[in-house]
Every structure is written in structure tokens, then in C-alpha cells.
Amino acid sequence: MTTPHETTRKLDNQAPHLDYYPHWLDNLADDVILQGAVFNGELRGADNVGKMLSFARSLYVFQDFRFYGMRGDLFLEDYRSRIRGTEAYHPDGVEIYNFVVVYFNDEGETSQLVMNHRPQSAALLFSSLLSKHFGDVFDPSLFYDGDVSAHLLDRDLSRGKFPPSSHTEVG
């Protein structure tokens, strides 16, 4: 039996610019499930989930955490970030917030992940960036491929709950 902090498989860290690395990523169960606001459905399997999360983290310019750690049997993360925009659409990036719930199985492996990105327009942009990167690697219906530019809400939703970030520029 492994613990929630024990490494069973090491993922490729595509986001070395981020100070925080979630070690539960290196302990994905073979049948792990990833659900999130950026998906129209869910991803299953350690290889698929690992590939998705490893790349998705690379889209963050920074992560400012309000909280991360164990709460009972769950691991929780609450953070804000900035994701890159496109050349024609918010090239300086878009503010995005995420609340993550990590569930563990009886063996201590990461068995389910629920990621709640907000606001919706930023989550849809994030989904479209994932779609553009992965192409047909995953079912295209898993991602949003429409235009969010007319509906983008790009303002601070933190209500002062996050510390000011010194990481404001897209690298």
C-alpha cells in the first residue's frame, strides 16, 4: 500500500517555471478519473490523465495559492493563475481560478480529480488551448472549440482573498 505522497510513476514536468509541483501527480492509479470544467466529459487512465495535466500546467504563467494540502482524506488546492491568450485574443493572458479536489483509493493512489476552473470564459479558453495542443490525441468533443472572445470576463474575482502576485507577465 502506498501513501498519498509516495511516488509510483514520475511524470514529465512540463512546467518547471512553477514553484509548486503536486506530488499526487506521480501517484496516479491506473484507472484514475479526471473531471473538470474545461472538459465536456472526463478522462480516464493514468497515461491520459498524466499527459493532460503535465501539459495543462505548462499553460499557467504562475500559481498563487490560497491553500493546498490534506483535509481529512482529501487533498485540496485553491489557486489563481494566468493562462496565455492567443495572438489575436488577449495576448497578455487571462486570469483564471481553480479549486481542485484529489481523491485517493485504498492503496493511497490518486483515484479521482475534480478541477473547477472559473470564470467560465477562462475555462472555455483553457479548453480550447488544450484542444489546439492535443488535436486528435483525445476525442475532440472533449474540448470547447468555439470563440470566447466576445464573452471573456477578465477581471479579478478573488475579492482580495489572494495575495498580490509579482508574476503578471506572460513568459
Question: What kind of feature is each model-predicted range?
Answer:
Residues 1-171:
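C-terminal and inter-domain tail/linker signature
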